[in-house]
């Protein structure tokens, strides 16, 4: 199967392919998958598709409507492509999507901690993954440089008014706000 075929099938849902990798035992991918392709949102297409959703399985009245919608659109794509759908919101145990994202080479750790996308900054997310039993060719996204490398001022480090990002004595406690 071609990577472009996966991209096209995922794009029809409003989601986008966010990169792929060939997992090792340390990656915690179940079922002996040879290739994992991450799926998520970057840009407005997912939100437009979610807002327009009205079919069965697109419940917007449940406790987790975006998760329900994601399952409703990604599971059929996985089935059609011969893959298994994995989700970051199912668990415990939870799949290590942040580590998987770093494995694709397409995102970087920002100075404040969250992963940053070279094109969309912090405005991106991972909604699922497609696990394939066969080894597929995936593009090397490692050449995408972090936008933080060329940002000398790093305003993100002191922009948050409550200091929610960065080290604190008790990381579980809410950030203080004066």
Stretches found by the model and what they are:
Residues 1-178:
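Non-ligating segments of multi-cofactor redox enzymes
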């Amino acid at each position: 199967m071609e990577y472009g075929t996966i991209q096209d099938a995922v794009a029809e849902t409003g989601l986008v392919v966010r990169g792929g990798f060939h997992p090792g035992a340390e990656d915690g991918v179940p079922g002996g998958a040879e290739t994992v392709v991450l799926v998520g949102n970057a840009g407005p297409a997912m939100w437009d598709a979610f807002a327009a959703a009205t079919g069965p399985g697109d419940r917007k009245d449940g406790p987790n409507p975006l998760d329900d919608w994601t399952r409703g659109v990604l599971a059929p794509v996985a089935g059609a492509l011969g893959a298994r759908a994995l989700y970051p919101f199912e668990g415990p145990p939870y799949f290590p999507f942040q580590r998987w994202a770093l494995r694709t080479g397409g995102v970087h750790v920002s100075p404040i901690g969250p992963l940053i996308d070279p094109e969309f900054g912090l405005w991106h997310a991972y909604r699922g993954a497609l696990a394939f039993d066969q080894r597929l060719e995936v593009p090397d996204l490692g050449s995408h440089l972090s936008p933080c490398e060329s940002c000398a001022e790093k305003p993100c480090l002191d922009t948050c008014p409550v200091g929610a990002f960065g080290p604190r004595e008790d990381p579980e406690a809410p950030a203080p706000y004066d």
